[in-house]
Amino acid sequence: MFHEKPDKLLLSSIESFEIEPDLLTLRRIEEVINKTNQYRSNTIENYETKLNTMKSEFQSLMSEINLLTKVSGINYENLKLLGNGNEESMGDLSNKNIFNVMNEKSIELDNLKLSLAKNLNDLESQINSMNITKKDLMEKYELVKMKNDNLINDNILKNPDSKAIKINIYKNLGVEIESGEEGETENKQDKVIIYNKETNLSSILNIDDKYSEYFITNYIWDRLQGY
């Protein structure tokens, strides 16, 4: 055996090996690898298809949401009534999300409430101040009126004639008598100033010696009754 040629010896050794089982195992491994690669490719393809479908559905849903949340039509008109509502503050809302705009309007309304509350407090303070001033003026008016009435009453008591009584009646009806001695002009005539509350008109009569008491009385009564 050892005297045989090396090539024959090698060939004989190779032929003695059983390689078929190993080859079969290798083929099976290759088949498994191929099947695994095919399964992997199919799985990736399926996932890519599903992903593209989901992307398309997502874009479609986003378009619908944007359309539903878009500020337009009646929404725009209603939002104009909230907050400031001027064109500058509204701007171009056609591309804005309605919920974002509503949040902005909510902030505007809160600011407006604060501003109105401040203005209301200021008005109440002014009204209180004016009421105090009015009360003070009314007290002064009543005091002056009381003094004037006292002077007239004292004059009537001291001069109980018909002229003083008439003057008192006229004053109560809105007639003022201005003495000529109080004027600064050369004309020293007395004046009767008649104010008609209903017509809101005033008349002035310069008392002249040529006018009788009857004429003056009728003139005053006519003016008080609106002519």
UniProtKB/Swiss-Prot annotation:
It holds the Pfam family Spc24. InterPro entries: Ndc80_Spc24 (IPR013252), Spc24_Fungi_globular_sf (IPR038066). It comes from the Eukaryota. Signal peptide: none annotated. Acts as a component of the essential kinetochore-associated NDC80 complex, which is required for chromosome segregation and spindle checkpoint activity. PANTHER family: KINETOCHORE PROTEIN SPC24, PTHR22142. Belongs to the SPC24 family. This is Probable kinetochore protein SPC24. It comes from Debaryomyces hansenii (strain ATCC 36239 / CBS 767 / BCRC 21394 / JCM 1990 / NBRC 0083 / IGC 2968).
